[in-house]
Swiss-Prot record:
SUPFAM superfamilies reported in the protein's UniProt record: BPTI-like (SSF57362)
Sites annotated May be the major determinant of the binding affinity for potassium channels: K5
Similarity field: Belongs to the venom Kunitz-type family.
UniProt name for this protein: Kunitz-type serine protease inhibitor homolog dendrotoxin I
Species in which this protein is naturally found: Dendroaspis polylepis polylepis (Black mamba)
């Protein structure tokens, strides 16, 4: 189980048109992965860095 409920949310790029590099926790693979966020919308499973994603969602 991930550390927080936000980590089980599916990747959601949002509904705008920017291309912003971001990271999310992939529940199936149990790891953080990169994706492109649109700049608005989406959900809480979105992080600026892979380190922030790992700190939030992966148990040590």
């Amino acid at each position: 189980q991930p550390l927080r409920k936000l980590c089980i949310l599916h990747r959601n790029p949002g509904r705008c048109y920017q291309k912003i590099p971001a990271f999310y926790y992939n529940q199936k693979k149990k790891q953080c992965e990169g994706f492109t966020w649109s700049g608005c919308g989406g959900n809480s499973n979105r992080f600026k860095t892979i380190e922030e994603c790992r700190r939030t969602c992966i148990r040590k």
